[in-house]
Amino acid sequence: YTGGWREARQYLERYRELGGAMDREAYYMLGFSAYMVGDYRDAERNLARAAGPDDKLSQNASYHLADCYLRMGRRQQAMQAFAMASSEGYDEAIGEDALFNYGKLQYELGGGYFNEAINVLNRYLLRYPQSGRVPQVKEYLAAAYYNSRNYDAAYRAIMQVPHPDNDLKAALQKITYFRGL
């Protein structure tokens, strides 16, 4: 259902067109209403204006901005926005999801990010040890250690995964081999 958001967006756009003062909250509402109706480009423009100081509004704006970037295929920017949303501790659920996605994108984007992915994923495990995502985080962590050629740490990380899949078991065999060299 997007009807209420479409109407809210129309009123906010009309207010802006008539010269109404647009503060961060107004830009957030305009951006969020655009987000809710699937206009991610307009959402990006307005949510970016709402993000800024270290407060709850900025955390929410950064989080939804990150999702806009993901939906537009801009993963690097999404990673940066998730990093912002994860560092601000106002909404715990948003912080947890943002930190997970930040670590996941650090890992998936690869390149020189494996050490940073390891740091972010370890931070997730420290902050949210009871999360249902812990097994998935440990899989990413094991893969990041493997890709960084830290085979001892990769071995320890895989051994902590409760039910490793076949890919992880194959990685464990390779890691064991490389540890023996």
Question: What label would you give each PLM region?
Answer:
Residues 1-181:
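Acidic, polar-rich low-complexity tracts and alpha-helical solenoid repeat scaffolds
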